[in-house]
């Protein structure tokens, strides 16, 4: 099985959203897609949180480059 990536998960989540919005799935099919979508959304959120934790802003202070943790505004 291929390694799951943020991009592939987001793409699959968008496809699931379109399928659910179409109204053409059975109740059982909709529930399965909904469950899969929740799992994909959680994975994407975890990936974003991990990326946010790694983001650093380089700031110049006293002629030296200093790494500063990213702070969301």
Curated annotation (Swiss-Prot):
GO molecular function terms attached to this record: exodeoxyribonuclease VII activity
Enzyme class, spelled out: hydrolase
Subcellular location: Cytoplasm
GO cellular component: cytosol; exodeoxyribonuclease VII complex
Entry's Gene Ontology BP terms: DNA catabolic process
Record keywords, A-Z: Cytoplasm, Exonuclease, Hydrolase, Nuclease
Reactions catalysed, as given in the entry: Exonucleolytic cleavage in either 5'- to 3'- or 3'- to 5'-direction to yield nucleoside 5'-phosphates
EC number: 3.1.11.6
Gene3D superfamilies with a match to the protein in the record: Exonuclease VII, small subunit
Presence of the UniProt keyword Lipid biosynthesis in the record: no
Superkingdom of origin: Bacteria
Cited PANTHER family: EXODEOXYRIBONUCLEASE 7 SMALL SUBUNIT
Subunit structure, as described in the record: Heterooligomer composed of large and small subunits.
NCBIfam families per the UniProt record, alphabetical: PRK00977.1-4, xseB
Function description: Bidirectionally degrades single-stranded DNA into large acid-insoluble oligonucleotides, which are then degraded further into small acid-soluble oligonucleotides.
Protein name: Exodeoxyribonuclease 7 small subunit
Gene that this polypeptide is encoded by: xseB
């Amino acid at each position: 099985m291929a390694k799951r990536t943020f991009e592939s998960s987001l793409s699959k989540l968008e496809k699931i959203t379109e399928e659910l919005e179409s109204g053409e799935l059975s109740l059982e099919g909709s529930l399965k897609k909904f469950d899969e979508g929740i799992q994909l959304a959680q994975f994407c959120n975890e990936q974003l949180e991990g990326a946010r934790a790694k983001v650093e802003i380089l700031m110049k202070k006293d002629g030296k480059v200093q790494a500063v943790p990213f702070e969301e505004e």
